[in-house]
Amino acid sequence: MPDYQKEIERIGEFLRKIIADRKAVIGISGGIDSSVTLGILSKFFLHENIKAVFMPDATTPKSDYDDVDVLASTFGVKYSTVNIQNIVDTFSKTLSAVDKGAIGNIKSRIRMIVLYYFANIYNGIVVGTTNRTELLLGYYTKYGDGGCDVEPIEHLYKRDIYEIARLLGVPESIIKKKPTAGLWQGQTDEDEIGMPYSKIDDILSSIFDKGELREDPDFKKILDLHSKSDHKRRLPYSLSPD
């Protein structure tokens, strides 16, 4: 088993080097990834140097509000709440947007804009919360939750995040809840992807860590998701100077 306590220390020192004397700006949702990232920040930075922002919308369940409250209290960090629904409504009305997926991506990009607003006024660094599972699947919004200055947990699979969450003392209600990107009502990651994270991590590790390929429908599905999301992991295409 990996030494997760040592990994927490490694991530913390990495963040200290990157953020230095600036403010860490992080979006929190009551989900496992942002909770773990906030927990690590709270161990390595003065709490007044952490700007945590909760950005609910009309589809955000009350349980997320409660979990964010308990999370902030657990780690002794104050947070701001910015309800983005009015902004979402303005975009949707202006664009006559009705596609659920497109509106979900609008929400994610609005949250990115809000975080960079706070980074702007506080001379801060936006801290991302994408994990390795999401990165390899492309399960994040380009220039949305994928838009940040540093990704401290991007090398960790979802299963690693849960182990670190327990070490940090992340509230049990957050550890037990079904992961969701919060893009529409009732959405869960595993339902949308079509398989549990435990299986996804096993397949991703087999492919990308061990170089194993199998004639298996689930392997094919994961490889297809990885291939179709390749553009998310690349810088924009450009020409080289003559």
Swiss-Prot record:
| Record field: catalytic activity | deamido-NAD(+) + NH4(+) + ATP = AMP + diphosphate + NAD(+) + H(+)
* Domain of life, source organism: Archaea
Q: Pathway of this protein?
A: Cofactor biosynthesis; NAD(+) biosynthesis; NAD(+) from deamido-NAD(+) (ammonia route): step 1/1
Which annotated residues bind ATP? 27-34, 129, 158, 180
Pfam families given in the database record: NAD_synthase (PF02540)
Q: What is its EC number?
A: 6.3.1.5
Q: GO: which molecular function terms? A: ATP binding; glutaminase activity; metal ion binding; NAD+ synthase (glutamine-hydrolyzing) activity; NAD+ synthase activity
What are the record keywords, sorted? ATP-binding, Ligase, Magnesium, Metal-binding, NAD, Nucleotide-binding
Annotated GO CC locations: cytoplasm
Q: What is the main EC category here?
A: ligase
Q: Which residues bind deamido-NAD(+)?
A: 109, 142, 149, 231-232
Provide the assembly information: Homodimer.
Q: What is the protein's known function?
A: Catalyzes the ATP-dependent amidation of deamido-NAD to form NAD. Uses ammonia as a nitrogen source.
Name of the protein in question: NH(3)-dependent NAD(+) synthetase
Gene for this chain:
nadE
